[in-house]
């Protein structure tokens, strides 16, 4: 039975579609290979492995054994294998200090190996939002796909792919905060409209320190955007000492004229380069 992974290989050319042995092991030879002869998959999208979950898996394997063999390929170094699928099982077996592990050896290219690792993890739905976004980006690059085509192959909405990829445009501190579960993906998406990395990191600090929820974060973003749109008032030039003396002299003279019984209508306007004084004397 063909696994959905195969839809990525050969861009639909059936004769080039390899089968993923993990899901159809009846026709594959299962070998016992040394645990210490295996190296991790360099295309592994997962960067964080939960020690607690590895420990739980190790207990299950200790009780029931390995139901599904891992999948590996030969490396250039003789007697060494690179993981294609099953890193959690391999780590669990390492913790049990087993010497050998059941495995199926495949002859996969780098592209096929990377695709299997990426898609296997995506389908397990255990990746962080950032790891998932990097996986999507890598698949788009490996197979020269559009977001829409990738969404169809994974059975996801195009908007889901797009929303995840937008997270990769956020500054590194924000991405790390998602990975470390200091903020949620929704918090991170709320920061995107700010655009300026400095503002995004500033608000990130506030979210963490004040434990802001998503709605509060969105409100803060709106306020920060409004503040950025306000144009600062142009600075007026300071009056020189001579200008102040001249204006005071004129005002005193006008005051003396009004004291004599003549009603004046005066207006003062201040411009960038000068002060305009308008005097109206009724006939």
Curated annotation (Swiss-Prot):
It comes from Bacillus subtilis (strain 168). Effects nucleoid occlusion by binding relatively nonspecifically to DNA and preventing the assembly of the division machinery in the vicinity of the nucleoid, especially under conditions that disturb the cell cycle. It helps to coordinate cell division and chromosome segregation by preventing the formation of the Z ring through the nucleoid, which would cause chromosome breakage. It comes from the Bacteria. Residues 148-167 bind DNA. The keyword Cytoplasm applies. GO terms for molecular function: DNA binding. Induction: Expressed constitutively. This is Nucleoid occlusion protein. Keywords: Cell cycle, Cell division, Cytoplasm, DNA-binding, Septation. The lineage of its organism: Bacteria, Bacillati, Bacillota, Bacilli, Bacillales. GO terms for biological process: chromosome segregation; division septum assembly; positive regulation of sporulation resulting in formation of a cellular spore. It is found in: Cytoplasm, Nucleoid.
